[in-house]
Amino acid sequence: MDATGGGNYDAKPYLPGSHAVKWFEDGEPTTLVDDYYSSRTLVDKMIDYVDASDPEQPFFAYLSLQAAHMPIQAPLDYVDRYNGAFDDGWDVKRQERLQRTIDRGLVPPTTTLAPAPAVHRAWDDLSAEEKAVAAREMQVNAGMMEAADFHIGRLLDHLEATGQLENTIVMVLSDNGAESGKTSFDGLANLGLDAIKLIEGFDTSFENLGQRRSLTAVGPEWASVLSAPFDLYKFYGSEGGLRVPMVIAGPGIAASGVEHAPVHVADLVPTMLDAAGVPYDPAQFYGHSALPMLSGRTDTTYNDNESFAFEVSGNAALYRGQWKITRNTPPRGDAEWRLYDLSVDPGETTDLSAANPALFEDMLAEYRAYTENVGVFEVGPDDYAITALNKNLMTKVIHKYWPHMLVFLLAVGGALFFAFKMGRTALRRRAS
């Protein structure tokens, strides 16, 4: 479904160029219920699956919500709970979020914010109308998250009512940092997007933001707030793209509050197998079981000499203890590697590669070994994430909308030809 750009209220695709949203159940095409809203309906379906299972047998359930992926949409009562909450704008809110995370002990007091990318707009440069729209978009995002929280709570309440919660380990986490997608651009690109919105029947009025037939996103500036105090957001190798919270509770899990030791996504399966008492060969997994740390038997899943890595379309990172090397490609990065000490600088503001050349080179060599081991293909500028995404979208747009483009070009050509003829006729009359 996600590859075809599904919305939250119906099967209408939001991605330009997508012809239909395809939903499947048990490998077979299916249709949505009439009153579909993504978080509510997906939780309803998960409850049905749990109820249909054998209560005497263990179960594994994976609930992948659309919240808060674009298009951000939420019932109006959730959105209106945040009236005025974001009127101060993203510059103020990013600073507030930094201080709040420090006050709550989520990051060290030495944490500072990386400068916002030059392409980000300053809040004070926006018109009053632009500020109102931007604040409302962030309200929709907050409402969507609260709606998701409510429906996750319904699932947990159901497990508790059926006597299964006390014997169930629950993990709640995100797949990546905040999404920076936007639904308006500058110049001709925006004219083209407005034409697509008109063709597809989107209602982008202020009153309809986040509602049915809307096309709403928070954009890169609010994404920086959502990822703060970390740098950047989804797609990138900075902490804002990679570091997300994970909440886990259940039998055998110590109620220890905030744990700062990292857990890699590849650790999840070994952790679940370990918790369920299922024998497995650790050598067959890239990740480690985090259960010893989660149960309070150890302080961390990785010792200071162990590493783990990520790569997505040229953006990459490798972690070892308190250290991290990272590379971000354009348009937000320059494809150069940098070294950070996350124990004091999780905002990734001070590159320490020149001060620690031996460590830097050793970690680079380890990253290269990782890419060879897992088969990472090094991409060039034409294949960087955003570049490739835009090229693919443009190909789909041309394929889907070429008849409309042809009609438009013929209309423009006809108008120009008519204007030319009228002008020439007028000149002849003046000459005579």
Regions found by a protein language model. Give the residues of each.
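Short, solvent-exposed turn/loop segments enriched in Gly/Ser/Thr/Pro and often Arg
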Residues: T4, A61-P71, L113-R121, V172-S180, ...
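C-terminal cap/loop subdomain of S1 sulfatases and analogous C-terminal strand-loop tails that border
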Residues: A3-G7, Q211-L242, I253-L342, L389, ...
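Long, internal low-complexity/basic segments
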Residues: L113-V119, D125-A134, L268, P331-E336, ...
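Histidine-centered active-site microenvironments of extracellular/periplasmic hydrolases
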Residues: M1, Q73-A74, D157-A249, N390-H399
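Formylglycine-dependent
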Residues: M1-D88, V92, A118-G143
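Active-site rim elements
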Residues: P29-Y37, F86-D88, E137-G143, D231-F235, ...
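Beta-strand elements within well-structured catalytic alpha/beta cores of enzymes
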Residues: M46, F59-L65, N141, M145-A148, ...
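Loop/turn elements at helix/coil->beta-strand transitions in domains of secreted/extracellular proteins
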Residues: D54-A61, Q164-V170, D304-N305, Y319-W323
